[in-house]
């Protein structure tokens, strides 16, 4: 689904997007969801997550601040989402940095029907079984396109490897998204927020196919470009990013001709 159509549908339906995410970026993630046009809920208690996912249009799982109880909540929510057939989006934050994170990402992928995975080049390379260097939650180098292609093929789902250029692969397609701004890399949680936007678009489309994911990332990157104009630094940029997400979602026609999504080749 293309950005304009997704944003119009979000404005009409206001679907609930259920996040089980990390406590570092939870506020930014919730606000990015709201500004995009969906309704965020940040429920993580094991006792209620299945019920909450049962009312949602999409589920977004983020392992940024990981513990065993949270993993059990993610599995319970994911099973409920799978029963209802709603999209499940995974952000494998820090996969490759520690054994726990790598193992947890693998467990979620093996026990749940995940619709799309969004991460940096190092995280995606780790899931694809490629050599990768991940320091903390940051990727150090790596070929994002190669990682996305390999992971999409081996996992059998949509994979987005984000960076200066985002590569979205799946179903024999490979797309490149060139929207964005370097200041996005100066704000902690911007990657989490971009995955949240993917969840919003997936809720609108009812799926997380490569085109839907690519246009979600292009919309987010376009908001980053707009926010950077006049921003004094990372602090003002973060506030302006939310303003830009809201402005573009309120008037999708402003995206016309601005989204840079192209074919990245499939081999």
UniProtKB/Swiss-Prot annotation:
Pathway: Cofactor biosynthesis; thiamine diphosphate biosynthesis; 4-methyl-5-(2-phosphoethyl)-thiazole from 5-(2-hydroxyethyl)-4-methylthiazole: step 1/1. ATP binds at residues 118, 162. It holds the Pfam family HK. Substrate binds at residues 42, 189. Signal peptide: none annotated. This is Hydroxyethylthiazole kinase. The keyword Flavoprotein does not apply.
């Amino acid at each position: 689904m293309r950005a304009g159509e997704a944003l119009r549908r979000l404005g009409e339906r206001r679907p609930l997007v259920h996040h089980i995410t990390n406590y570092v970026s939870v506020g930014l993630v919730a606000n990015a969801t709201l500004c995009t046009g969906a309704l965020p809920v940040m429920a993580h208690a094991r006792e209620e997550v299945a019920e909450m996912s049962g009312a949602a249009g999409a589920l977004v799982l983020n392992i940024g601040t990981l513990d065993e109880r949270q993993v059990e909540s993610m599995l319970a929510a994911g099973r409920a989402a799978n029963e209802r057939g709603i999209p499940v989006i995974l952000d494998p934050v820090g996969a490759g940095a520690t054994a726990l994170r790598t193992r947890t990402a693998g467990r979620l992928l093996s026990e749940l029907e995940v619709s799309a995975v969004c991460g940096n080049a190092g995280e995606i390379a780790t899931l694809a079984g490629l050599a990768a260097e991940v320091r903390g939650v940051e990727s150090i180098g790596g070929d994002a396109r190669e990682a996305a292609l390999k992971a999409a093929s081996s996992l059998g789902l949509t994979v987005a490897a984000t960076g200066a250029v985002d590569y979205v692969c799946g179903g024999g397609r490979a797309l490149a998204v060139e929207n964005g701004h370097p200041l996005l890399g100066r704000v902690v949680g911007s990657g989490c927020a971009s995955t949240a936007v993917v969840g919003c678009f997936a809720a609108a489309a009812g799926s997380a196919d490569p085109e839907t994911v690519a246009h979600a990332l292009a919309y987010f990157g376009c908001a980053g470009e707009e926010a950077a104009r006049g921003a004094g630094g990372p602090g003002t940029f973060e506030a302006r990013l939310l303003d830009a997400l809201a402005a573009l979602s309120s008037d999708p026609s402003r995206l016309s001709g601005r989204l840079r999504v192209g074919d990245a080749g499939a081999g």
